[in-house]
Swiss-Prot record:
The active site is at residues 49, 52. It holds the Pfam family TXD17-like_Trx. The keyword Disulfide bond applies. Residues 1-136 form the Thioredoxin domain. This is Thioredoxin-like protein Clot. Disulfide bonds join 49-52. InterPro entries: Thioredoxin-like_sf, TXNDC17-like, TXNDC17_dom. Keywords: Disulfide bond, Electron transport, Redox-active center, Transport. GO terms for cellular component: cytosol. Belongs to the thioredoxin family.
Length: 139
């Protein structure tokens, strides 16, 4: 099946999230994933977060592999947290949001039935078997 990647910033996240992850939308059978990441530097195409730079290729590889082996499409909403000072602010919207309560990036969340069904934090997001467990969790 296919992987649809959608990028969002703090400013436009809610519009993308509401469209792609509506609570009553689970019937269409898509695997819905949120990936919270550090912003990229335009000149290097790398993020300011070393963990994100290591984990991203692993996550994309495992998501693509899962989509090929499933009969479901995958939606991957990549949410960029901002620059380092913005992310470090304890009042960052995604740190405070009870749906996410982010403590680090990258964070991968599988979304089902209007809530986080599986989650992988920054300390394990680079491990292929852990990514597989989140991506392939039964819904």
């Amino acid at each position: 099946m296919t992987v649809e990647k959608v990028d969002a910033t703090v400013a436009d996240f809610d519009a993308h999230f509401d469209k792609l992850f509506a609570a009553g939308d689970d019937a269409e059978g898509k695997v819905k994933l949120l990936l919270f990441l550090a912003d990229r530097d335009a000149s290097s195409n790398q993020t300011w977060c070393p963990d994100c730079n290591v984990a991203e290729p692993v996550i994309y590889d495992r998501v693509e592999a899962a989509a090929k082996g499933k009969e479901k499409d995958v939606v991957l909403l990549r949410a960029y947290v901002g620059d380092k000072p913005t992310w470090r602010d304890p009042a960052h919207p995604w740190r405070a949001d009870p749906r996410f309560r982010l403590t680090g990036v990258p964070t991968l969340i599988r979304w089902e039935n209007g809530a986080a069904a599986a989650r992988l934090g920054d300390d394990e997001a680079h491990l292929a078997d852990k990514v597989d467990a989140v991506v392939n969790a039964a819904n």
